[in-house]
Amino acid sequence: MKPGFKDLRAVGYQTDVPYVSLSNYCWSFNCPKPGAEVEFLNMTFQLMNSTATIVQIDADIEQSIDMVSNGSADITLVSARQTLDRMKKVDFTTPIGFVYYGYLVREIPELAVADYIMRLFDYDTLAILISFGLIIGALLYLYTWIFGLRVRSLLDWMFISCSGIIHQFMFRISSPICALVLIGFWLLCCLVIITYYEAKLKSFLLLSHHRGTIFNTLDGVLEAAEHKGWTLVIQERGYTPYLYCNPSQCARLDRLKSRINFIGADDDANLLLGQDKHVGFSALASDLAETDITYFDYHSKILFVRDKIMAPEYLAYAVNKNVKGLREKFNRAVAYTKSGYGTVRSRYIASFPSYNSVTSQSQTITVLQTSHFIQLYKFCFIFYGIAIIVFILEIIFHRMTKNFTFFGHSYNYHLSGFEWRFARPKWIHFPRRNTVILPLSKSYSPDNERRVTVC
């Protein structure tokens, strides 16, 4: 056997169960059950006919990579995420796995999910609909007062408009042109109902397939913190959303500083995550979290929910660029030992049990909020403001020029009558399956309608 490397120096965490499990009493590769990745690294060194020692410094991943980069160590004790910034400092070996970003959250009971589904309207949406009802009622009162038609009190018209909104009546106006501002407000009210009520209901019906959780993306977590009172839990030396957030998401995180609970590296995060409306951030190897939702702590009912947008990242050991031949020889050895990594890891921890393996989690759910349509509302209000200005100018012009002369010709300008009505949506008949309705005869009557059922 060819001689290998002698006295390689490995550096990393002192304790990061199940990957590293060292103590002040035993800080070497010969410790009993030193951790899955420490044992795997030692097994690979033995195949390389190499020896190594562990630098007795409790260093996190960033500190370990810096030490490998400046020559204080030769290789990391555990695998690390392979990123472009780190590749500028060190070389990476053949990946031994993947890591998935995700969120730690206590299981949400089905009753709570059902309650979340039923709470379709927020206060801002109710305020919009109520204000539209009052505006439409006031405009109806104004138009009927101007044109002297069906004079009612202001409260009566507001009650009629709100009733029409609740029943989703169609509102039709035939004249005058200036009164189209009224139908504009009516259509905007219908837009709020359709985009918020019906679309959000559909979103939550899809979301009910995701039993146990109400979000699976960073945007969903941020919306829960912004609008639903959730608290973000970030642990020192752990994974944070700043590792993978885009600029807009990072800005939202900065605005949510008051909603973030920072805890120490030695604190038990499960004590906080077991409370209502608390969510933590983590990343698990693919062999531990094999499905989209898994039990991180079965007894505490804490789930690990994979992020549906972020792609997994490689996990590999970082080696010093200046140690000639170390990476190549290590990679050749890993080609033989990699298949046994699962066996080594299973001696320390089993894969987390799947929470909902049957349910398909392939869809990315977007929970619609009123804020998603702010730009559309702005454009609508701008156009309606223009329409109101035109309406006022038309009334002023009417008052000033009832009779005017232009190039010797007399003209009369008057506003046409105000005509409006509520109309129920047309009733549409949907026949049952396998039912054929024959064409009507000329002498048709409802009593002799013929139907043929296809078997």
From Swiss-Prot:
<feature type="glycosylation site" description="N-linked (GlcNAc...) asparagine">
    <location>
        <position position="403"/>
    </location>
</feature>
<feature type="glycosylation site" description="N-linked (GlcNAc...) asparagine">
    <location>
        <position position="70"/>
    </location>
</feature>
<keyword id="KW-0812">Transmembrane</keyword>
<feature type="glycosylation site" description="N-linked (GlcNAc...) asparagine">
    <location>
        <position position="42"/>
    </location>
</feature>
<feature type="glycosylation site" description="N-linked (GlcNAc...) asparagine">
    <location>
        <position position="49"/>
    </location>
</feature>
<dbReference type="InterPro" id="IPR040128">
    <property type="entry name" value="T25E4.2-like"/>
</dbReference>
<feature type="transmembrane region" description="Helical">
    <location>
        <begin position="377"/>
        <end position="397"/>
    </location>
</feature>
<feature type="transmembrane region" description="Helical">
    <location>
        <begin position="127"/>
        <end position="147"/>
    </location>
</feature>
<dbReference type="GO" id="GO:0016020">
    <property type="term" value="C:membrane"/>
</dbReference>
<dbReference type="InterPro" id="IPR001638">
    <property type="entry name" value="Solute-binding_3/MltF_N"/>
</dbReference>
<protein>
    <recommendedName>
        <fullName>Uncharacterized protein T25E4.2</fullName>
    </recommendedName>
</protein>
<keyword id="KW-1133">Transmembrane helix</keyword>
<dbReference type="Pfam" id="PF00497">
    <property type="entry name" value="SBP_bac_3"/>
</dbReference>
<feature type="transmembrane region" description="Helical">
    <location>
        <begin position="153"/>
        <end position="173"/>
    </location>
</feature>
<keyword id="KW-0325">Glycoprotein</keyword>
<feature type="transmembrane region" description="Helical">
    <location>
        <begin position="177"/>
        <end position="197"/>
    </location>
</feature>
<keyword id="KW-0472">Membrane</keyword>
